[in-house]
């Protein structure tokens, strides 16, 4: 009898404890990032960008670090969420956006020193549902075709990550991500509109990257997907792709638009994506980041290689790295140095004058 009574009391205590834990649980959208600069700068980071004279790097757990001395030292800054961050971009020296898991969009107006949340997956789902119903009521056939996608997006909640962000100016910007997840703002991020039914992506491939070239906006993604934003139609139209593997990034060099991705595949176009030429790379590593470096540009790979383009456009040379790692992103620290983010935080790599002049 005593054993039964003890078991009953224990069960009640366990249930009460579980209920308390459930009531107290807070997800990454509700918990600010923990600030520990030493830990954050030496562990995995996923993206880095230039903000005027500063550099800003982002990574897991909502980590954001800022450097004001070309990457020589870093300071972690407070962030209102602890969601994993994937990409960061600046439209000018002060205004920037970071995006990542849980549908998070963060904005800074002071070169990365402070951040506010402008959108998350829960809000995105509500906006998508409302916009979808309105579009269907107005007779949009494209919206009707997206019903299954929108329904899944709403039902599955805040789990869809944004993988890239690009603002054309301080007001108009785009975010893209997994499973055709895409939104646009025209008021600096105060409000957002879904683009699900305004993208020629019937298989809902992941959207990995955004870039502008010659005044036009492009997107790239899974299985060779390339898209061009038709401003008149307000629609991302598919472009004939030179490659059926995934593209992880796009880079505007001024003269050309570079698309890079899986297994070292790099392509360039100089005629508005009508034709593409393949650029040979020295290794089959997936290319995951790119940045302009003076008159040249550099790419980084998951295999820890830094590739510097040759002046004649014929290919790349591998630049020795002082501390190679599995790279995820790269930005120019100066005309002669790069800052790379990856598996072991951030690294500054100096490119010798001779190496640049010889290319």
What do the predicted segments below correspond to?
Residues 16-20:
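N-terminal signal peptide c-region/cleavage motif recognized by signal peptidases
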Residues 21-359:
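Residue-level hotspots at or immediately adjacent to binding/recognition sites across diverse folds
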Residues 1-9:
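Bacterial N-terminal signal peptides that target proteins for export
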């Amino acid at each position: 009898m005593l054993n039964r009574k003890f078991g009953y009391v224990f069960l009640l205590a366990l249930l009460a404890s579980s209920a308390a834990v459930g009531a107290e649980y807070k997800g990454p959208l509700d918990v600010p990032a923990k600030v520990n600069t030493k830990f954050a700068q030496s562990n995995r980071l996923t993206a880095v960008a230039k903000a005027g004279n500063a550099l800003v790097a982002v990574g897991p757990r909502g980590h954001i670090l800022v450097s004001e001395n070309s990457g020589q030292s870093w300071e972690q800054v407070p962030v209102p969420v602890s969601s994993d961050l994937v990409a960061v971009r600046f439209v000018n020296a002060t205004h920037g956006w970071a995006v990542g898991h849980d549908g998070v969009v963060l904005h800074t107006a002071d070169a990365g020193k402070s951040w506010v949340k402008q959108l998350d997956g829960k809000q995105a789902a509500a906006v998508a549902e409302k916009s979808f119903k309105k579009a269907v009521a107005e007779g949009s056939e494209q919206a009707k075709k997206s019903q299954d996608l929108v329904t899944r997006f709403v039902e599955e909640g805040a789990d869809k990550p944004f993988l890239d962000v690009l603002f054309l100016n301080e007001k108009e910007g785009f975010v893209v991500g997994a499973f055709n997840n895409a939104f646009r703002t025209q008021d600096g991020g105060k409000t957002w509109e879904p683009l699900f039914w305004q993208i020629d992506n019937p298989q809902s491939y992941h959207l990995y990257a955004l870039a502008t070239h010659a005044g036009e906006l492009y997107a790239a993604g899974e299985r060779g997907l390339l898209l061009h934003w038709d401003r008149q139609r307000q629609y991302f139209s598919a472009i004939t792709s030179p490659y059926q593997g995934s593209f992880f990034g796009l880079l505007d060099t001024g003269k050309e638009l570079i698309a890079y991705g899986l297994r070292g595949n790099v392509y360039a176009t100089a005629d508005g994506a009508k034709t593409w030429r393949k650029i040979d790379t020295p290794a089959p590593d997936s290319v995951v980041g790119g940045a302009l470096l003076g008159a040249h540009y550099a790419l980084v790979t998951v295999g820890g290689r830094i590739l510097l383009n040759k002046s004649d456009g014929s290919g790349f040379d591998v630049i020795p790295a002082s501390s190679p790692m599995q790279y995820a992103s790269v930005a120019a620290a100066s005309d002669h140095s790069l800052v790379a983010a990856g598996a072991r935080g951030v690294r500054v790599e100096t490119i010798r004058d001779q190496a640049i002049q010889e290319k």
